[in-house]
Swiss-Prot record:
Residues 14-33 bind DNA. SUPFAM superfamilies: Putative DNA-binding domain (SSF46955). Residues 11-79 form the HTH merR-type domain. One of its GO terms (biological process) is regulation of DNA-templated transcription. Keywords: Activator, DNA-binding, Transcription, Transcription regulation. Transcriptional activator of the copZA operon. This is HTH-type transcriptional regulator CueR. One of its GO terms (molecular function) is DNA-binding transcription factor activity. InterPro entries: DNA-bd_dom_put_sf, MerR-type_HTH_dom, MerR_fam. The gene is cueR.
């Protein structure tokens, strides 16, 4: 019997998940112990799997049909279904890169503004049209 979590999303007990993916309960248990699948636990300690776990299990089954090693499957799973912690790290790194770029752009614009008007015009004339448009956009954004 398919259940629902507190958000209303479908959940599956181990036997239901196994049947939907065409594997045994023991296989689901094995993949869970390896960390390839992550169940939620009920207050009575039953394991429940969500729709994402079903997609992951079907992906694992497809990879096994291609005779991929579980270590390779784990790598592919991380790329196919990134964890929220990994995405948080990537977003944090991206935010740092954006801050660094903003500082660089601000420094360049500050030096540009200190140039004589004729030197500014000369510099602008050397830029291709698409780069000039980007430069002017940055000037507007940061002014």
């Amino acid at each position: 019997m398919v259940g629902r979590d507190i958000d209303g999303a479908e959940t599956y007990r181990i036997s239901e998940l196994a049947a939907l993916a065409g594997v045994t309960k023991r296989t689901v248990d094995y993949y869970t112990n390896l960390g390839l699948l992550t169940p939620a636990r009920s207050c009575s300690n039953y394991r429940y799997y969500d729709e994402n776990a079903l997609k992951r299990l079907i992906f694992i089954v497809d990879c096994k049909k291609q005779r991929l090693a579980l270590s390779d499957i784990k790598d592919r799973l991380e790329n196919q279904f990134p964890s929220s912690a990994k995405l948080d790290d990537e977003i944090g790194n991206l935010a740092l890169e954006i801050d660094h770029m903003n500082q660089n752009i601000s420094g360049i614009l500050h030096r540009f503004e200190r140039l004589k008007p004729e030197d500014r015009d000369k510099l602008k004339s050397k830029l291709p049209p698409e780069k000039l448009a980007v430069f002017q956009s940055f000037m507007l954004l940061l002014s």
